[in-house]
A protein has these predicted regions:
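Composition-driven recognition of glycine/serine/threonine/acidic- and proline-rich low-complexity segments
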Residues: 1-132
Length: 132
């Protein structure tokens, strides 16, 4: 899978080139165009229903994601961010994770797991108790 980020720094667009039978997963509503040989399938975000609902409610992420797969020959699909702005890549290593701002996820390979962290709730609970 190859990708290019075009039109930086504002109005950035992520263009992904897929080999036959290669798949990229993306946030619902992020796709701007795809070639005719790219098939799209929609699924719930997480394997568990509670995980999907948690991401949707607390992470302000869509309940669904889309999987884009090139059929029979190479294909191209492009994505943009929800609030218009720049796009950056985060290269992941095994057992490494990132905490990113809600609504900033656009796309990833299929082996990336998305989860939520309770930072906002923890801060609020701690400030109500006057933690120091």
């Amino acid at each position: 899978m190859n990708y290019e980020i075009k039109y930086k720094p504002s109005y950035s667009m992520l263009v992904v080139s897929l080999e036959p039978n290669e798949t990229v997963t993306a946030e619902a509503g992020a796709m701007t165009y795809m070639e005719p040989n790219v098939e799209v399938k929609t699924r719930k975000r997480e394997k568990s229903l509670l995980g999907t609902i948690g991401l949707s409610l607390f992470g302000r992420q869509s309940f669904f994601v889309n999987d884009y797969t090139a059929q029979n020959k190479a294909g191209e699909v492009a994505f943009v961010s929800a609030p218009v702005g720049d796009i950056e890549t985060l290269e992941l290593k095994p057992n490494q994770g990132y905490i990113i701002q809600s609504s900033s996820y656009i796309a990833s390979t299929q082996n990336v797991e998305l989860d939520i962290k309770w930072q906002g709730f923890t801060k609020k609970a701690c400030s109500d108790k006057a933690c120091s």
